[in-house]
Structures are given as structure tokens and as C-alpha cells.
């Protein structure tokens, strides 16, 4: 079973744009869910929406959550507390840049990596430089 990814952002447009990029990567097809923005289209995050996104992917091969900003991380941590323990044990919150981490995670998941390796791939992008 493939590892799924949940994209947590304060902006639905930002998260949906990232999902579009990820779905366009060669060999993609990784299960993706978005938990972004407020219920009326405003900026924000919701622990309830994040928990729902995780549950929509199911336990499968595990789930990695990537968040755009610090308060998104706090919402994700709250969401984890709300999950059934049997699911929570298979869900991991990545300490990674939102875009670069998501790209690395999708590539690893598409290659068949397990949830620990997908998480490690995302977190390995923390020090990636864009310029020499």
C-alpha cells in the first residue's frame, strides 16, 4: 500500500497549487489530501479538517503530513490527538519545507518507500539550497 500525504496550508489556493504540481510529477499517483483554509474560504487551518483528511486516506501504508507554517503544525498536532490510536501510530508530521518536502515525499512514495523513508525524504530537504 502506498504512503499518503496530507497538505496543510493556511491557503486553499496554495495547497491546491502544490497538489497540482505533485500530481504532475513523473510516476506520481500517490494518495494526496488537502486540509487548507477556513470553511468560508478565509485563511486558516483546522484540526478537524486535518483529521478528516488523514482519515480520508486511511491507514494504508501510513500518512505523512506537511504543513506550511507554524500554526499549521500546531493544528496538525491537535488533529493527531483526535485520531483513533490505531491510525495515529501510522501518521507522521514532517519537519520539512512545504514545497520541497512534499516533492521529495511524493517521489519517495511513488518509488514504493515505506512511511519512515517517505518522512526521511521530506525532512532531508530542510537544508537544500537553491543557489550555490
Question: What do these predicted regions represent?
Answer:
Residues 1-132:
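N-terminal loops that bind phosphate or other acidic moieties
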Amino acid at each position: 500500500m502506498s504512503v499518503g500525504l496530507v497538505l496543510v496550508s493556511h491557503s486553499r489556493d496554495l495547497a491546491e497549487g502544490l497538489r497540482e504540481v505533485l500530481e504532475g510529477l513523473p510516476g506520481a499517483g500517490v494518495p494526496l489530501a488537502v486540509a487548507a483554509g477556513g470553511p468560508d474560504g478565509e485563511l486558516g487551518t483546522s484540526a478537524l479538517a486535518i483529521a478528516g483528511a488523514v482519515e480520508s486516506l486511511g491507514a494504508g501504508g501510513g500518512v505523512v503530513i506537511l504543513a506550511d507554517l507554524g500554526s499549521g503544525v500546531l493544528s496538525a498536532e491537535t488533529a493527531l490527538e483526535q485520531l483513533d490510536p490505531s491510525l495515529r501510530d501510522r501518521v507522521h508530521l514532517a519537519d520539512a519545507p512545504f514545497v520541497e518536502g512534499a516533492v521529495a515525499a511524493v517521489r519517495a512514495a511513488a518509488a514504493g518507500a515505506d512511511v519512515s523513508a517517505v518522512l526521511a525524504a521530506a525532512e532531508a530537504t530542510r537544508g537544500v539550497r537553491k543557489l550555490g
